[in-house]
Amino acid sequence: MKFMEIEKTNRMNALFEFYAALLTDKQMNYIELYYADDYSLAEIAEEFQVSRQAVYDNIKRTEKLLEDYEMKLHMYSDYVVRSQIFDEILNKYPEDAYLKEKIAILTSIDNRE
């Protein structure tokens, strides 16, 4: 797999984690099988008894939808920035128990389902 493909796969998996609840069941199934489980278009088409083209079209529409959600809501990009700031604070003040505790609380908020 090429670097750009890996990067896109990682991004789609991350966006899926944040916005899966906004997708239909079919969109969730196709994206999860394609990106997370590494199914081919043909394998997904066979499993759902549809054409490869139907799977391809659905995945492309869902990718655009996930990107649109991110453009409007910024949940993933905000999470990345928060994580970077937390890391910087912990690196600058590694012995500060108060900061560690507060960052742990904020991190648990980010990671709750």
Swiss-Prot record:
It comes from Streptococcus suis (strain 05ZYH33). SUPFAM superfamilies: Sigma3 and sigma4 domains of RNA polymerase sigma factors. It holds the Pfam family UPF0122. HAMAP family: UPF0122. It comes from the Bacteria. Might take part in the signal recognition particle (SRP) pathway. This is inferred from the conservation of its genetic proximity to ftsY/ffh. May be a regulatory protein. This is UPF0122 protein SSU05_0875. Belongs to the UPF0122 family.
